[in-house]
Design a protein with these regions (language model features):
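Conserved N-terminal boundary motif of the eukaryotic protein kinase catalytic domain
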Residues: 17-25
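Short beta-strand segments
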Residues: 48-51, 80-81, 176-178, 197, ...
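Short, surface-exposed alpha-helical segments at coil->helix boundaries
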Residues: 5-9, 63, 224-228
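An alpha-helical support segment within catalytic cores of ATP-dependent transferases
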Residues: 3-18, 87, 123-179, 236, ...
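Helix-rich C-terminal or lid/interface subdomains of diverse kinases
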Residues: 56, 213-295
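Conserved catalytic motifs of the protein kinase core domain
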Residues: 44, 91, 172-174, 192
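ATP-binding pocket architecture of kinase catalytic cores
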Residues: 25-135
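Active-site Asp-x-Gly
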Residues: 174-176, 187-235, 242
């Protein structure tokens, strides 16, 4: 989006009378939208603007999810304004507060990093659920999971068979989940988590599906041993574990087909793991999950 687009003036005027945009730059990532760090010459000052792409109708869903996430005890962007009618840029846009910090996808103090992620997940999963409806109650992963398309190698076939066999026995206990909780969406400042961003996929789902999703990202970055330490740290905090984690770990088999996108996102954040090694890490995580299920 060009800085000269008249939509920026309309946005600024919506946020504060006679306000002007004095500075802006596009942020790394953004997922299904283009995200910008924008500075105004008056309050609210520095904000993040997310402009959704043509044909993307998820802006109202994300706005609802972000507003619900305000009850989370960890720092979350504050919703400021929404243009769901596409009057600013010809596309839907939402404005939120900017949090301090940046992602850490190559931690030096791994033990502290893992412990902080586990505590953040636990804190998130303790969020009160009263009033959750609409976008937050869409079908959980256990109801929407499908095996990856195309021909499967032997490891993928075993994983798919194991998931298919265990799906009917998965519990229906739901907590509030971020939906995309991974290191690239966790901000750090001075060695501590300073916020969690991108609540576009937030919904009610099981804690084990979210933990498995995060483990998958950690495994891709740092290997299965570190991913296992995250599971241990989380289970130590909540006081129990479940074989369902292994089932959800196996559901992540499809992530191998999107590893190139994950690799590019990590590269933009300043970390460039060995792509083939990262794929081998994901395969090893699948083998460990199959072993835990005696499959």
């Amino acid at each position: 989006m060009s800085p000269r687009h008249p939509g920026w003036d309309a946005l600024a005027e919506t946020l504060a009378r006679d306000a002007r945009v004095t500075r802006m730059h596009r942020l790394v990532g953004g997922g299904s939208a283009d995200a910008y760090d924008v500075t105004l010459d008056r309050a609210p000052g520095r904000v993040v603007v997310k402009v959704f792409r043509d044909g993307d109708d998820t802006a109202p869903l994300e706005w609802t999810r972000l507003k619900f996430a305000q009850r989370v005890t960890m720092p979350v962007p504050e919703p400021i304004a929404a243009d769901l009618e596409s009057t600013w840029f010809g596309r839907p846009a939402i404005v939120m507060s900017r949090l301090t910090g940046r992602p850490d996808v190559a931690p030096k103090a791994v033990d502290s990093w893992i412990g902080s992620l586990a505590r953040a997940l636990t804190e998130l999963h303790e969020t009160a659920l009263d009033g959750a409806e609409g976008a937050l109650t869409r079908p959980p992963l256990a109801e929407t999971w499908r095996p990856p398309a195309g021909q499967h190698d032997s490891l993928t076939s075993r994983a798919v068979d194991a998931v298919t066999a265990h799906l009917p026995s998965l519990t229906s206990e739901h907590v509030f989940t971020h939906g995309d909780f991974n290191p690239s969406n966790v901000l750090w400042h001075r060695g501590r988590i300073s916020g969690v961003v991108d609540w576009s996929a937030a919904r009610l789902d099981t804690r084990w599906s979210e933990l498995a999703y995060c483990r998958d990202a950690v495994c891709f970055l740092l290997g299965p041993e570190i991913a296992d330490r995250l599971a241990d740290a989380y289970s130590d905090i909540v006081g129990y574990t479940s074989d369902e984690l292994a089932v959800y770990d196996l559901m992540s088999v499809s992530s191998r087909h999107y590893a190139a996108a994950s690799f590019e996102a990590d590269r933009q954040l300043g970390h460039t793991p060995d792509y083939e090694v990262s794929l081998a890490h994901l395969d090893e995580q699948l083998r460990r999950a199959l072993k835990r299920l005696d499959w």
